[in-house]
């Protein structure tokens, strides 16, 4: 994300699974569980949408939601410029009704986008026309803080620099204990 005032959009559904996730492995030492399902037709729709929308110049940044899930993806998008932050809100926990699955689930076919307000309606309309689930999560800010509320409850309000430090130190820490 390059600037404050960008809309942050989720393409794809809210996750309903945690099996095989990095979260389960690092937090609970579990390397098992039913891995997220793969729907190749749905994945192709997402990839075709991304190619078309990037080619049109309507997307400023994109990040897949894979290892670590939604929360890791959004923080990684903010690391390039620690003066930026984001103010995000998700209306519900989704199908799983679990906060951990929402934040750390690694379901396939999901991407975060940063889009200018000028292109927001075009991107939303294009996703809907392509049959993709899409929701605006919030906007980038110049606060240097990541704020996230879920179902009306604030669950995170932290400095991006602090999140980056935790993220960067966790990799060597986990490697020393694997």
Segments the model singles out, each with a brief description of its role:
Residues 1-40, 51-54, 108, 116-119:
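Mobile "lid/hinge" segments at catalytic clefts and subdomain interfaces of large enzymes
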Residues 32-33, 47, 53-178:
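Glycine-/charge-enriched secondary-structure boundary and capping motifs
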């Amino acid at each position: 994300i390059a600037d404050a005032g960008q809309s942050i959009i989720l393409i794809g559904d809210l996750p309903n699974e945690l099996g095989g996730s990095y979260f389960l492995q690092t937090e609970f030492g579990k390397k098992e569980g039913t891995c997220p399902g793969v729907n190749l037709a749905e994945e192709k729709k997402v990839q075709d949408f991304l190619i078309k929308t990037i080619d049109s110049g309507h997307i400023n940044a994109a990040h897949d939601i894979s290892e670590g899930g939604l929360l890791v993806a959004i923080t990684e998008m903010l690391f390039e410029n620690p003066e930026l932050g984001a103010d995000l809100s998700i209306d519900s926990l989704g199908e799983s009704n679990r906060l951990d699955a929402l934040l750390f689930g690694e379901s396939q076919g999901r991407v975060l986008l940063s889009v200018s307000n000028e292109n927001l309606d075009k991107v939303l309309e294009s996703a809907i026309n392509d049959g993709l689930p899409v929701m605006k999560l919030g906007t980038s800010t110049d606060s240097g803080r990541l704020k996230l509320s879920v179902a009306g409850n604030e669950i995170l309000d932290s400095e991006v620099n602090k999140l980056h430090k935790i993220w960067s130190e966790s990799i060597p820490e986990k490697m020393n204990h694997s």
